[in-house]
Amino acid sequence: MGSTCVRIAIDAMGGDHAPNEIVAGAVRASEELGVKVLLVGDPQQIASALPPKTNLERVEIVPAEEAIAMDEEPLNAVRRKRKASINVAMDLVKREQADAIFSAGHSGAAMASALLRLGRLPGVDRPAIGTVFPTIKAGKPVLILDVGANVDCRPKFLEQFAVIGSIYSQYVLGTGEPPKVGLLNIGEEDTKGNELALRTHQLLKDNPNINFIGNAEGRDVLSGEFDVIVCDGFVGNILLKFAEAIGGVILQILREELPQGLHGQIGTAILKPNLTRIKQRMDHAEHGGALLLGVSGVCLIGHGSSQAPSVFNAIRMAKEAVDNQVMQQLQSQYEILHSASD
């Protein structure tokens, strides 16, 4: 992108803390990251949420008449509410008035809107939500997909997730060539798992474009032995939310187990830098969002409970994706691999 200002469309009405926290994180990103944020939603609510002295050169309010609630059926809502904030924001990307989009609202609605407006990459049947997990090996994250876009999957969907994930891991996360791919399963043996796992295992094993090293059990997810792990969105979403919770549990236990009184205060002061680093490695707010991989546009999906720090980090991820030409890399590499397999 060079010196061009990256433009991020923000679904300001999506999420549990919208629009206040969404706007706060977006404005901070405009100030610290040099991006232009297009806040899509109710103009009055967004304007009321803007901090004093906001630089309006990098912040623009784009009106949207409606919003999609978390309890609505996503596809019907996206089709019925054409002027919903997620649709208006997605249209900005489609018309190339924005370079990327972020939403902390209904993830199903975000995916449906992306599919209807941006379309899929050639050869991709279903996009997947991919999120990066920290591992016990510092600086060696693992990409997990799908973590919620598709609760029911066919074996070929998981095979495509593995290909897309491998490209993203290699060209964006900078892992070694080729990335090591695992299939989330209940055992290491080839014969373990349900029908989906067994059939997917064979597809991954037979695909020359995937460096499949075998099944990954739950205990292997954070081991650092895998660069990419694929699963259906039902299992992946449970895994994601468990991982988000366990970080907070560990930190709470550490705080409770530190001695009380003067010795405890001294110990806490000594350990504070370590605890901060642990929190940064484990807190989902540090990562901000997950990419919707497989659609023809940079689309970041945030947690429904996202607050300003998460929004800021999601926008940072979106900017990095645009700067690193993630879509161009995914499209060109996937087309090469897809053509070779035909």
UniProtKB/Swiss-Prot annotation:
Pathway recorded for this protein: Lipid metabolism; phospholipid metabolism
Domain of life: Bacteria
Catalyses which reaction(s): a fatty acyl-[ACP] + phosphate = an acyl phosphate + holo-[ACP]
Keyword Ribonucleoprotein: no
EC primary class: transferase
Subcellular location: Cytoplasm
GO terms for cellular component: cytoplasm
InterPro entries: FA_synthesis, Phospholipid_synth_PlsX-like
Record key words, sorted: Cytoplasm, Lipid biosynthesis, Lipid metabolism, Phospholipid biosynthesis, Phospholipid metabolism, Transferase
Pfam families: FA_synthesis
GO molecular function, one term: phosphate:acyl-[acyl carrier protein] acyltransferase activity
Enzyme Commission identifier(s): 2.3.1.274
UniProt GO BP: fatty acid biosynthetic process; phospholipid biosynthetic process
Function: Catalyzes the reversible formation of acyl-phosphate (acyl-PO(4)) from acyl-[acyl-carrier-protein] (acyl-ACP). This enzyme utilizes acyl-ACP as fatty acyl donor, but not acyl-CoA.
HAMAP family in alphabetical order: PlsX
Oligomeric form and interacting partners: Homodimer. Probably interacts with PlsY.
Family: Belongs to the PlsX family.
Protein name: Phosphate acyltransferase
Origin species: Trichormus variabilis (strain ATCC 29413 / PCC 7937) (Anabaena variabilis)
